[in-house]
Amino acid sequence: MATHLVIGDPHCTPKASNDRLLWAGKFAHDLKPDTIVCRGDFASMDSLSSYDHGNNSFEGRRYKKDVEHVHDALEQFNKGLNGRRPRKIMLLGNHEDRINRTVDEIPELDGTISTDDFKFKKYGWEVHEYQIPVVVDGVYYCHNFPTGVMGKPISGDNIGRALLIKNKVSST
């Protein structure tokens, strides 16, 4: 039987230490999972947030700082793994997708910024696009499962039940 370690939404940001990724890597080393799945939002990408853009609190956020902080977090995680090489799957989330949305809004940035800037593959991760499920040992993983014509995430009081009813598979 395969063991999966699931990491949900780390939201790496220059405002927070990456020590927790070192600890997570050490935990993964000790647990010895066959597969590690990060369910997305590894990066917070505060520099591309649309929620408080234009406010004084936004000043100081920079794309380059966000990306460099993600690189450091990936290095810390691998350091914690201490040579272990389980399969690592990175599902892109809506925070990584901020890059794609920014390029859609400002086409001049096409080819200048992209999710490839995170270099997840360099750090040993398989990368899967936002809202595209991946199946590992019969379990479906996705940052959020889109539903309906608009592709909005499944939501409500009992998301687990809704996932089973709509997808009819084990999913997380």
Region roles according to the model:
Residues 8-11, 40-43, 94-96, 144-146, ...:
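Active-site metal-binding loops of divalent metal-dependent hydrolases
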Residues 69-169:
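Conserved catalytic scaffold of divalent metal-dependent phosphoesterases
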Residues 4-6, 35-38, 90, 140, ...:
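Residue-level marker for buried hydrophobic side chains located in beta-strands
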Residues 1-75, 83:
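N-terminal active-site segment of His-dependent metallophosphoesterases
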